[in-house]
Amino acid sequence: ALNHQLPDRLPLDFIWPRRETLQALQLHFQADSAEGVFRELGIDFRWIPILACYPKFQMRVNGRLEGDAPGAGNEYVFHDPRTFEDQWGIVFRVGADGKYLEWKDGPLRREHALEDWSVPEVVYPPIEQISRRLESYQNYVTVTEIEFPFKLAWHLCGLEDFLMSMVSNPGMVEALYDKLYAFQTEKSVLGARAGYDVIAVVGDVAGQTSMMFSPDLFERFDVPRLTSLVAQVKRANPETKVLYHSDGNMEAIIPSLIRCGIDILNPIQSACMDPAAIKARYGDLLTFHGTISVQDTIPNGTVEDVRDEVTTRIKTVGYNGGFIISPENSIPYDAPLENVLTLFKTAREFDYSSF
């Protein structure tokens, strides 16, 4: 599928499952781990982080995030029981429902702060150690992810301030992006050299109806640097693919992403774009990943709705290969378990010989 050849069956992924969803599935399957759930569902991908150490940050850590919010189980610098700081100095607050995080502050909100700021000191494991860990997943597609610099930048600066700077202070944006892209390129190349199958570049640049900023700004700030990142990954390991993730309607930059060398596009959010039309337009140039609605069908639809969407998506996006089916993003924690099971059962049982 990744090489645009018709596979013997449809590849499956289960992107960013929430803790509550995994717990419900473990109970359903009587599985003792998330890995057991993935095997029961027939998932072909394994998202495996590169376990980096941030020495200066680690000296300040004073607690572990508990509960069900993203990042639960990780260590942070807590300002109060619900507010914490990560290794980049970005401050988040656990929402009132305990399920989601809210951005609160970043270290570059002050004027001229960039002059005194540098990326965090990081120590990665030896490449041999990373490669040995991947050996346990030889029968799966292995993925590690990096944060897209736009996402990191607005978390550091504040969204409104950073969007304004893209127009009013492009020199600052260039300087910040040089630092962020260099940091993420180093990690990406390490992952490729260690043997990861896919490097996922993750960060939203669009809302429901349009881009968060002009495609011309993406062309100016991101295209040269993203092209370099992808090229360095390919030099390190020609077999490694690069996936780009952005929710929302980001169709305006798809041609730019293709020119950058992106191999896989996720999630083709069906509430914002037409997956069949995107396949028809770009299917010879990109592999598509995702497309199953976590805004509507999975949380709110019937089992039949889920079955119909999965079948339609396979028929309209899965022809000629180049398609990996997955939820578009994390499935909401209160989505019916039957719908989650139906998604993967329908995909597994689809008769691919009909193509």
Residue ranges and their predicted role:
Residues 23, 27-64:
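Segments that shape or occlude catalytic/ligand-binding pockets
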Residues 57-120, 139-140:
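A contiguous, low-structure linker/loop signature
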Residues 1-33, 85, 94, 98, ...:
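Active-site loop segments of alpha/beta catalytic cores
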Residues 12, 43, 47-49, 70-75:
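Secondary-structure transition motif
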